[in-house]
């Protein structure tokens, strides 16, 4: 019985290749798009669709900024699909106007995974392995624990799945301590080949999505805030390159020397900038470093890391 499986598979593959050849001859434009999607290449000039945020824009949570990025990218990246573990409104991951996926509507791009984070993670892995799609899945950061085995397998297999984990701090509203992630962020950073990015504001969030979509050798986790954060003037021209490097000098010391380095991620970056101003009043020169991704920073050349964090500046504070 087993010996017949090989020839059956060969016949099925030959039939599929004949159908593909016929399709390519009949639908040339669609066939080129199919080849692109199956190869994992992103559409040309897709980066131009990334939104840019201004410092005078009203403060917004990075989960809201992420939703705006998805709204901008969905029309230009047709293979971008995803959903949430029954938390799409809260995680801002619903693609408006693109319908829901079901057996009757396979063209829908929104997936309702249900309250089953581990199942969602496993489904994302299967979608990525099958090919032709770029899936993301969302839940609260605290619930990443429920999908950890699926995340670890994605990292082991080098699958470029994207996780959107929101409500990343104690500012989680009325839900209380059961929804406050404490140890989750550090434990996720320990998973080999999982790129964790915790952006400081809207522009860093857009840059984080760029990194996630261009990363092909493993999963990426976007860790986002529930509470509103200011749109920092310092990130407008620096975020795209800075986030890709994992850490960068966001604001140099206003004095002619650096007495201390303040290192922060996510919602604490704005606090670091305020601390820099207070220290300046005391004639203490503070450099502020935004470090959204430890693993990406670790991959940088030594000269870059030493430029951001010089060894002779021994006073450092991580917030």
Question: Model features per residue range: what roles?
Answer:
Residues 63-72, 122, 146-151, 206-210, ...:
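Short alpha-helical segments and helix-capping/turn motifs at coil-helix boundaries
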Residues 76-80, 105-109, 130-134, 156-162, ...:
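Short coil/turn connectors at secondary-structure junctions
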């Amino acid at each position: 019985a087993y010996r017949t499986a090989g020839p059956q598979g060969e016949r099925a593959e030959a039939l599929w290749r004949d159908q593909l050849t016929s399709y390519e001859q009949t639908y040339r434009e669609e066939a080129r798009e199919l080849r692109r999607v199956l190869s994992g290449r992103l559409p040309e000039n897709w980066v131009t669709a990334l939104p840019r945020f201004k410092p005078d824009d009203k403060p917004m949570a990075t989960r809201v900024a992420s939703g705006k990025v998805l709204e901008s990218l969905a029309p230009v990246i047709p293979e971008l699909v995803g959903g949430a573990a029954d938390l799409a409104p809260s995680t801002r991951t619903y693609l408006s106007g693109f319908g829901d996926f079901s057996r009757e509507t396979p063209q829908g791009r929104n997936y309702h995974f249900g309250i089953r984070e581990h199942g969602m993670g496993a489904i994302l892995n299967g979608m990525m392995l099958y090919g032709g799609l770029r899936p993301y899945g969302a839940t609260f950061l605290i619930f990443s624990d429920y999908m950890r085995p699926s995340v670890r397998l994605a990292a082991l297999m080098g699958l470029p799945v994207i996780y959107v984990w929101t409500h990343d701090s104690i500012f989680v509203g009325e839900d209380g301590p059961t929804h406050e992630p404490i140890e989750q962020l550090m434990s996720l950073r320990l998973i080999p080949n999982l790129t964790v990015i915790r952006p400081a504001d809207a522009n860093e969030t857009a840059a984080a999505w760029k990194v996630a979509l261009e990363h092909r050798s493993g999963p990426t986790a976007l860790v986002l805030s529930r509470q509103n954060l200011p749109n920092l003037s310092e990130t407008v021209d620096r975020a795209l390159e800075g986030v890709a490097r994992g850490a960068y000098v966001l604001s140099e010391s206003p004095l002619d020397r650096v007495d201390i380095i303040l290192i922060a991620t996510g919602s604490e970056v704005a606090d670091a900038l305020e601390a820099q101003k207070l220290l300046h009043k005391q004639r203490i020169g503070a450099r502020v470093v935004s470090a959204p991704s430890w693993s990406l920073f670790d991959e940088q050349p030594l000269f870059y890391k030493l430029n951001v964090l010089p060894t002779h500046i021994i006073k450092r504070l991580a917030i």
